[in-house]
Amino acid sequence: MIIYSSTKQSFIQDFEQGVLVKKLHQTLTEKYRRVGESEIHSWQTSLSYMANVMRDFAIPELAGVAIEYIVPNTQKRVDFIITGLDQQDNEHVVIVELKQWGEAFKVTDKDNIVSTYLGGGIREVTHPSYQAWSYCSLIENFNEDVQNRPIKLHSCAFLHNFDESISPELRDPIYNDILNISPMFTLGQMDSLRNFIK
């Protein structure tokens, strides 16, 4: 199930008109579950950054945008998806995992695990790049279109509040394998994220 689906052009218009979060809230509440204030605030913040990312003439107006895609047979929700064609008309899907983290720390004794402040305390969670890559893997296994057509899946993480000069540990060499296949973009790297999408 996809909570919101449109073109890049309509996504930006919905954001600029102030109706995007309302549409997300209404659809998710009607079809799935109640939405808390913290999730609404999270959408407002992260999607403003994604609207800025998508305001690039090199990203086609008719590129597809999906928000809050619920992977079938799971409780996993993909934050942001961009779909489109390259210059050779090959289909591409870019999965973007959005985080508002300000700080995180490496965990050396577990693969692709980091620790960060969540829910009032420090918690161990998957590295955001690994989380995005795992969604690609799930979609490859559960989506018939991806299985039956030559659609290329790409993943990345966008931590728009994350200042690597203060908290550099998410790029520790222990995470190189996942960062090489699912890059991470942080505060001040919006142009790099745009280039990855293009």
Regions found by a protein language model. Name each.
Residues 1-198:
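Accessory nucleic-acid engagement/destabilization modules that flank
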